Amino acid sequence: MVKKLQIAIDGPASAGKSTVAKLVAKKLGYIYCDTGAMYRAVTYAALKANISLDDDEALKNLLQDFKLEFVPAEPEQKVFVNGEEVTQIIRTPDITNNVSLVSAQPSVRQDLTHRQQEIADNGGIVMDGRDIGTTVLPNAEVKIFLVASVEQRALRRYKENIAKGIDTPLEVLEKEIAERDYKDSHRKISPLVQAKDAVKVDTTPLTIDEVVNEIMNIIEERNH
């Protein structure tokens, strides 16, 4: 029987991680764990509770009763926080622009890292985020680091937003993505860095199918 692998896909904002991770998981019949949605869900709960987003102690208390569920659905899995469906609301600009601050808090990273490791324990998982290959699943058999130019990533985010009825100017998105890159790669705990044993894939010139095929080839090589 082929061993069920842990597959870590990391990279900056809008590099195509979740789109690619979902497709790879589907091809392999693996579970997909969207760690970005987990941090967004905590950000949503904190904003709703009027907690200061850099108050580590208050966030720690919030997480004690924080129930997060992913429910399989088409076209994408649904996300629930304490029984409330938040699938769409956690993708709004208010959450997007605040999630880096919440993600930088030690108690939040510790709590969610533990939850993510529990989900991945049995293998057969594709997990995407910023620190999966370095911190969450350091022993993952396959580690991918996706990159793309700021311009290309802003264009992708712009198209996604338009499809959802959000019209943020392209230059604003470029600025926001560059700022998120800086915050993500300069935070003290689990900054965004490529794991030493990760394979870098530049998605700028590639279609989604081409990226998926490249990753499937890497997985194939590692599995023999």
UniProtKB/Swiss-Prot annotation:
Superkingdom in the source lineage: Bacteria
Enzyme class: transferase
UniProt keyword ATP-binding, yes or no: yes
GO biological process terms on file: nucleobase-containing small molecule interconversion; pyrimidine nucleotide metabolic process
Subcellular location: Cytoplasm
EC number: 2.7.4.25
Annotated ATP binding sites: G11, P12, A13, S14, A15, G16, K17, S18, T19
Family as reported in the entry's similarity comment: Belongs to the cytidylate kinase family. Type 1 subfamily.
Organism whose genome encodes this protein: Ligilactobacillus salivarius (strain UCC118)
UniProt KW keywords: ATP-binding, Cytoplasm, Kinase, Nucleotide-binding, Transferase
Catalytic activity: CMP + ATP = CDP + ADP; dCMP + ATP = dCDP + ADP
Name of the protein in its database record: Cytidylate kinase
HAMAP family listed in its UniProt record: Cytidyl_kinase_type1
Originating gene: cmk
A Gene Ontology cellular-component term: cytosol
Pfam families, per the entry: Cytidylate_kin (PF02224)
Gene3D superfamilies: P-loop containing nucleotide triphosphate hydrolases (3.40.50.300)
UniProt GO molecular function: ATP binding; CMP kinase activity; dCMP kinase activity
NCBIfam families (alphabetical): cmk
InterPro entries on file: Cytidylate_kin (IPR003136), Cytidylate_kinase_dom (IPR011994), P-loop_NTPase (IPR027417)
